Regions:
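A short, Trp-centered hydrophobic/proline-enriched beta-strand micro-motif
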Residues: 65-82
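Solvent-exposed strand-loop boundary residues in beta-sheet-rich modules
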Residues: 81-83, 124, 198
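Gly/Pro-enriched, hydrophobic low-complexity segments
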Residues: 149-152, 156-235
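Extracytoplasmic
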Residues: 70-72, 86-88, 94-96, 106, ...
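C-terminal segment of N-terminal export signals and the immediately downstream linker at the start
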Residues: 19, 37-58
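N-terminal secretory signal peptides
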Residues: 1-20, 24, 28-38
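An acidic-aromatic
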Residues: 45-46, 90-140, 202-203
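Surface-exposed, polar helix/loop patches in the mature regions of secreted/periplasmic/lumenal proteins
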Residues: 123-167
Length: 235
């Protein structure tokens, strides 16, 4: 399981065991979905960004180009919620606007973006929530092309072969922040953290990432898992 820490000015990759159970997976899944599903809110004050050096600006352009170049991706992930709940699983991404999370412990939980909406489904509880993709932090990662032109960089850390970048939206900075962590030389996307309006953080760390493969479009099609049960009660 991979997490990112900071020590003595460097960004380090930390490896530590985690205890995973069904309750933790559901808790983490709910927290992660809440972060991705959080709609943006109107800002009370303009955001304040850090002063970027020419090297920082060049690195931002490099990161934007790198992310935009990722057309498809498969990876294992570890997700940690604000309450400490931990879950693992696998994800698929296709640009623009499509992503699918499946959790190891509970196949009943699904998080899906289909270019238009982000869906959170819990089959055991027979619950589904959805919100427009472009109104969520997920859109910052899934849009095409990826750009920083409408974002404010509130933190930029450079370590030994690593970059950590925190951004908020210029128009709605109170909606939360997105922090991205990359290995460098060469660039590699390692982790993101979403902090929602309630200042609760959900972190997703990637491992065994693969890029550029053909993905079945059906992975990103929402299919109502409750349709059959509803039909049983229709007159």
């Amino acid at each position: 399981m991979v997490g990112i820490g900071k020590s003595e000015g460097d960004l380090r990759v930390l490896r530590e065991p985690v205890v995973i159970n069904r309750r933790a997976a559901i808790t983490a899944g709910l927290a992660g979905a809440a972060a991705l599903l959080s709609p943006v809110a109107r800002a009370a004050a303009p955001p304040v960004g850090v002063v970027l050096t020419p090297q920082d600006t060049a690195d931002l352009q490099r990161v934007a180009a790198y992310l935009s170049s990722i057309r498809t991706m498969y990876a294992r992930f570890q997700q940690v919620s604000a309450g400490g709940g931990t879950a693992t699983g696998q994800l698929w991404m296709a640009r623009p606007g499509r992503m699918r999370f499946e959790y190891d412990v509970s196949s009943a939980i699904l998080l899906l973006a289909d270019m238009f909406y982000v869906y959170y489904v819990d089959k055991e509880l027979a619950e589904m929530s959805k919100v427009g993709l472009k109104s969520t932090p997920a859109w910052l990662l899934l849009r095409d092309p990826v750009t920083f032109s409408d974002l404010v960089v509130t933190r930029f850390d450079r370590g030994a072969n690593a970059l950590r970048i925190t951004v908020v939206e210029k128009a709605e900075p109170d909606s939360g922040s997105l922090t991205m962590v990359f290995s460098d030389q060469p660039l590699g996307f390692r982790q993101w953290t979403i902090v929602d309006q309630q200042r609760k953080a959900t972190t997703v760390s990637l491992s065994n990432a693969q890029f550029g493969m053909a993905l079945d479009p059906k992975l990103f099609v929402y299919q109502d898992p409750f349709a059959a049960s509803r039909r049983q009660y229709e007159p």
